[in-house]
């Protein structure tokens, strides 16, 4: 019971809540309990799959800050799986972009967000709202054409080719390898960095 109390305290919950039933907790409290459960085995590595997706914005910020504090305190490494790119940018050191189960790009977070090389990454980032209304109005959006292909029967070659404006014949026949374009920055595209 002492260990449970310590873990609950570590994630910002009063140890007395340990006697409650699960339905008595809010979403944020449940997430804190999930984090405490993960910490119970004293891990070095935690997989966090959409850890804040079902929470309101204030609680999201609290959970992200808790995760960052715990990372610093315990030297944790996270595999943070998320679709909220603003949060990904805030919490990540390195980012991997996937499309239909294949790696499109891997880079240090700052490089990926400032200088994306893969067309899919460029499209993803162009969809992220910018809080500055003037900048938001003036920036150009990249619009994807076509329908996403089937993940059960993905296209040959590059999986993004059916929606990519740079696609050529080679993209259908030769899956692009991950190629390093800058230190630690790799992209799987025959025409990486060419989308304007």
Language-model features: locations:
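Conserved ABC ATPase "signature" region
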Residues: 1-16, 122-126
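Interfacial catalytic loop of ABC nucleotide-binding domains
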Residues: 2, 19-21, 139
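Conserved ABC ATPase signature
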Residues: 21-25, 29
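Conserved ABC ATPase nucleotide-binding domain "signature" region
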Residues: 29-32, 36, 61, 149, ...
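Conserved catalytic motifs of ABC-family nucleotide-binding domains
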Residues: 42
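P-loop NTP-binding/switch modules centered on Walker-like glycine-rich loops
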Residues: 47-51, 55-137
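Charged, flexible cofactor/metal-binding loops and thiol motifs
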Residues: 108-196
């Amino acid at each position: 019971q002492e260990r449970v109390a310590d873990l609950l305290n570590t994630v910002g919950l009063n140890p007395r809540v340990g006697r409650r039933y699960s339905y008595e907790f809010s979403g944020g409290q449940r997430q804190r309990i999930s984090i405490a459960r993960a910490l119970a085995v004293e891990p070095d590595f935690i997989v966090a799959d959409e850890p804040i997706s079902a929470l309101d914005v204030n609680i999201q910020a609290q959970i992200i800050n808790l995760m960052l504090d715990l990372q610093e305190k315990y030297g944790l490494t996270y595999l943070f799986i998320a679709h909220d790119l603003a949060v990904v940018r805030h919490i990540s050191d390195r980012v991997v972009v996937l499309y239909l189960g294949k790696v499109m790009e891997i880079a240090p977070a700052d490089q990926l967000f400032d200088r994306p090389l893969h067309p899919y990454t460029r499209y993803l980032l162009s969809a992220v709202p910018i809080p500055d209304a003037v900048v938001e109005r003036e920036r150009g959006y990249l619009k994807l054409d076509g329908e996403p292909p089937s993940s059960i029967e993905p296209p040959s070659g590059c999986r993004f080719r059916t929606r990519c404006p740079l696609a050529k014949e080679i993209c259908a026949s030769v899956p692009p390898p991950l190629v390093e374009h800058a230190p630690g920055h790799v992209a799987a595209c025959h025409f990486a960095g060419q989308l304007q």
